[in-house]
Design a protein with these regions (language model features):
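Alpha-helix N-cap/helix-start motif
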Residues: 14, 61, 77-80
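Short, polar loop motifs at secondary-structure junctions
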Residues: 39-41, 53-60
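Ser/Thr/Gly-rich flexible loops in soluble cytosolic domains mediating phosphotransfer, phosphorylation
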Residues: 68-94
Length: 94
């Protein structure tokens, strides 16, 4: 399984959220086989990952990708972990 964090340019904010996703996966004791990466929203495509994560500002553009976790606040680690846990449970990954 692969998770792709996307932002406008694929640099700072998506990289920061990627690191937070990795931390959340450890805390959730998720399978080590789950991969996490980051990219810009424009080059992201549905076949690049099973789950995509983005901020609320990119929600409309990200809908074309498939399974998307939308964060109201990309700095909120609690929100990220709660939404990630719910998504992974719904996909039988936890």
């Amino acid at each position: 399984m692969k998770i792709l964090v996307v932002c406008g340019h694929g640099l700072g904010s998506s990289f920061m959220v990627e690191m937070n996703v990795q931390e959340a996966l450890k805390q959730l004791q998720a399978p080590a086989s789950i991969e996490v990466a980051h990219s810009d929203i424009m080059t992201a495509s549905p076949e690049m990952a099973d789950v995509f994560i983005c901020g609320r500002d990119l929600e409309e553009n990200a809908q074309r990708l498939g399974e998307v976790i939308v964060l109201d606040n990309i700095l909120d680690k609690t929100e990220l972990q709660e939404k990630l846990e719910a998504k992974l449970k719904s996909m039988n990954q936890l």
